[in-house]
Curated annotation (Swiss-Prot):
Record keyword Oxidoreductase present: no
Similarity remark: Belongs to the universal ribosomal protein uL5 family.
One term of GO molecular function: rRNA binding
Domain of life where this protein originates: Archaea
Gene from which this protein is expressed: rpl5
Species of provenance: Thermoplasma volcanium (strain ATCC 51530 / DSM 4299 / JCM 9571 / NBRC 15438 / GSS1)
PANTHER family given in the database record: 60S RIBOSOMAL PROTEIN L11-RELATED
A biological process term (GO) from this entry: translation
Protein name, per record: Large ribosomal subunit protein uL5
Length: 170
């Protein structure tokens, strides 16, 4: 295989959506920092929802973006929690995978703290090929990514099965 066609992990995004600002948001940030070792950023509401008492640009969640070795290490921990099984519908047509973890105490070494409570999280795995993505980002001569470079769903499944020993439940 061409070295530039090799699939790699671009990033792993871990998100906890709280739905409200305040004390629960700071506790969720503390949980993410304990799990990943990185300081989380706040996510803001895109629009106001009167029924849920949410205003536009109100912080309603926290997320951490992990890259390179940090992403691989966290992904191994998260897949261990899921017993290395991901459902087939978790993959999109661009080769990215998404799954949820219902409780942070499922991770190795994490214990329930009554002061924090229970928080679940969403994990997004973004894959890319080693080369070819610059043509979409550059200023001069910007073009769309050709279909030969785009990652298909079955390639992403094969990558995770081979590198992380994940079984995809169909």
């Amino acid at each position: 295989m061409n070295q530039m066609q090799e699939i790699i992990i671009d990033k792993v995004v871990v998100n906890i959506g709280v739905g409200q600002a305040g004390d629960r948001l700071t506790k969720a940030a503390k949980v993410l920092e304990m799990l990943t070792g990185h300081k989380p950023t706040q996510t803001l509401a895109k629009k106001s929802v009167r029924d849920f008492n949410i205003r536009k640009r109100l912080p309603i969640g926290v997320k951490v973006t992990l890259r390179k070795d940090d992403a691989v290490n966290f992904l191994n921990k998260a897949l261990y929690v899921k017993d290395y099984k991901i459902p087939d519908y978790s993959f999109d047509k661009h080769g990215n995978a998404y799954f949820g973890i219902s409780d942070y105490t499922d991770f190795k070494g994490m214990k329930y703290d009554p002061d924090i409570g229970i928080f679940g999280m969403d994990v997004a795995i973004v894959l890319k090929r080693r080369g070819g993505y610059r043509i979409e980002k550059r200023k001069i001569g910007k073009k769309t990514i050709p279909s030969s470079i785009r990652i298909k769903k079955d390639e992403a499944v094969e990558f995770l099965e081979k590198n992380f020993k994940v079984s995809v439940v169909r």
